C-alpha cells in the first residue's frame, strides 16, 4: 500500500488509533483511487481535506451516540469519525454494491465495530433496519433540502443532522428554510469544527429533528400522542 504520512496534528485527533487512521489513508490512496472512490489528485491532501475534515465532526457528538453516515461512499465522514471517537456507534449507509464491498474490506481490515448497510437512507427497509439514530452525518451527498429530508427520516426526535458543507452553507440554509421546516428540521445553524488543526475549519450544518415541544414530530405524521 502507498504510505501517506499523517500531519503532526493527527495524533491529537486519533490518539492511540492513529495507526488505524494511517492504514485507512493508505486504503484511500490505493484501492480508493483504483476503484474511483477518490480522485488521483486527492492523494496528497487525503489527511487535511478528507480524513481530518471528517474526524472534526467528533467535536459535535456525544459518547454513546448511534450515528448513521448516509451516502458513505469511501467511508467519509463515517470511518474517520469512528476512529476519532471509539465511544460512538457508527453505521455506514451506501447504495452502491462496489462501494459497500470497499467499506466492508476496510472495516474488516481495521477491526473496528462499524456496520455497513447497503441501501438508501430514504428507503423504508433501510430505516427499519437501522432504527432511529441520534446523529446522521453526510459529506458531498446532495443539496441541503434533500439531506434534511433523508436525515430527519432516520433520526429520533431531538436527534441531530451534521452535514459537512462548503462556503455556501449559510446561503443554502436561507434558500431552503421552508423545505427544512417541512422536513421537521429546527435549530438550524452552521458550526466550525476542527479549528485547532484545520485551516480553514470544517463547515458543518447542524439541525435537530423537531420534537412535540419545539415543532413538528416525524415528517408526514402528527406529533400528537
Swiss-Prot record:
Its EC number is 2.1.1.-. The lineage of its organism: Bacteria, Bacillati, Actinomycetota, Actinomycetes, Mycobacteriales. PANTHER family: S-ADENOSYL-L-METHIONINE-DEPENDENT METHYLTRANSFERASES SUPERFAMILY PROTEIN. It comes from Mycobacterium sp. (strain KMS). InterPro entries: rRNA_ssu_MeTfrase_G, SAM-dependent_MTases_sf. This is Ribosomal RNA small subunit methyltransferase G. It is found in: Cytoplasm. Belongs to the methyltransferase superfamily. RNA methyltransferase RsmG family. HAMAP family: 16SrRNA_methyltr_G. It is an enzyme of class 2 (transferase). Keywords: Cytoplasm, Methyltransferase, rRNA processing, S-adenosyl-L-methionine, Transferase. GO terms for cellular component: cytosol. The keyword Cytoplasm applies. One of its GO terms (molecular function) is rRNA (guanine-N7-)-methyltransferase activity. Residues 204-225 are annotated as: Disordered.
Amino acid at each position: 500500500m502507498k504510505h501517506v504520512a499523517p500531519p503532526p496534528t493527527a495524533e491529537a485527533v486519533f490518539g492511540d488509533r492513529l495507526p488505524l487512521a494511517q492504514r485507512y489513508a493508505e486504503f484511500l490512496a490505493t484501492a480508493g483511487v483504483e476503484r474511483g472512490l477518490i480522485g488521483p489528485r486527492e492523494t496528497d491532501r487525503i489527511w487535511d481535506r478528507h480524513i481530518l475534515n471528517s474526524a472534526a465532526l467528533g467535536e459535535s457528538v456525544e459518547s454513546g451516540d448511534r450515528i448513521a453516515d448516509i451516502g458513505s461512499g469511501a467511508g467519509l465522514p463515517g470511518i474517520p469519525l469512528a476512529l476519532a471517537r471509539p465511544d460512538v456507534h457508527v453505521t455506514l449507509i451506501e447504495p452502491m454494491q462496489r462501494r459497500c464491498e470497499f467499506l466492508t474490506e476496510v472495516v474488516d481490515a481495521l477491526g473496528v465495530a462499524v456496520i455497513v448497510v447497503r441501501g438508501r437512507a430514504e428507503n423504508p427497509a433501510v430505516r427499519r433496519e437501522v432504527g432511529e439514530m441520534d446523529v446522521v452525518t453526510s459529506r458531498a451527498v446532495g443539496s441541503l433540502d434533500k439531506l434534511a429530508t433523508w436525515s430527519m427520516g432516520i433520526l429520533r426526535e431531538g436527534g441531530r443532522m451534521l452535514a459537512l458543507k462548503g462556503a455556501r452553507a449559510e446561503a443554502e440554509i436561507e434558500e431552503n428554510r421552508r423545505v427544512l421546516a417541512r422536513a421537521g428540521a429546527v435549530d438550524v445553524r452552521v458550526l466550525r469544527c476542527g479549528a485547532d488543526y484545520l485551516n480553514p475549519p470544517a463547515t458543518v450544518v447542524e439541525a435537530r429533528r423537531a420534537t412535540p415541544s419545539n415543532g413538528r414530530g416525524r415528517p408526514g405524521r402528527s406529533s400528537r400522542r
